[in-house]
């Protein structure tokens, strides 16, 4: 029963804000402010209860922030070699020939799309290995 929305209002700090899907509005909880603009946010569901939220900080290079699905505790950050000023991200959890465990796609500088193998993210941040299956 959680929805995270990327809020870019710098007057109060660009960050993720927590809302409820059960009809209540803003729950009064915000994550720490981002350096740039809080951009796309996706839920990486590893099971019915476990997983991670991934959001992107629109800086150069883009910084991808990973949070525990249940607690919202930071699980780590990562960047790509050629990914900057990301406006949006999309998560594909289905297997494909190129990405057997799925991929995170990120818009790069309004000109291209970058892809991150979910297995690489799991390894780099020491996340739950069940998320890479």
Where are these regions (language model features)?
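Structural motif
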Residues: 11-18, 61-67, 111-124
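Residue-level signature of beta-propeller blades and closely related beta-rich strand-turn architectures
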Residues: 9-10, 58-59, 95, 108-110
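Conserved blade-ending motifs and adjacent loop-strand segments that build the rim/top face
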Residues: 28-42, 71-96
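Structural signature of eukaryotic scaffold interfaces centered on beta-propeller domains
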Residues: 1, 42-49, 90-102
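Beta-rich catalytic cores
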Residues: 12, 37, 60, 85, ...
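Residue position within the beta-strands of beta-propeller blades
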Residues: 5-6, 55-56, 104-106
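Beta-strand initiation motifs
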Residues: 22-29, 49-51, 70-76, 121-132
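Loop/turn-rich, solvent-exposed surfaces of beta-rich toroidal or solenoidal domains
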Residues: 32-74
């Amino acid at each position: 029963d959680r929805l995270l929305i990327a809020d870019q209002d710098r007057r109060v700090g660009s960050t993720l804000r927590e809302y409820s899907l059960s009809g209540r509005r803003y729950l009064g909880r915000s994550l720490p402010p981002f350096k740039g603009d809080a951009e796309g946010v996706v839920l990486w569901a590893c099971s019915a209860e476990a997983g991670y939220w991934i959001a992107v900080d629109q800086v150069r290079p883009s910084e991808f922030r990973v949070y525990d699905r249940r607690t919202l505790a930071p699980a780590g950050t990562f960047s790509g070699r050629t990914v900057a000023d990301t406006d949006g991200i999309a998560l594909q959890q289905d297997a494909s020939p190129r990405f057997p465990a799925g991929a995170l796609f990120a818009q790069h500088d309004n000109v291209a799309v970058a892809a991150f193998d979910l297995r690489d993210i799991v390894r780099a941040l020491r996340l739950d290995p069940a998320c890479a299956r």
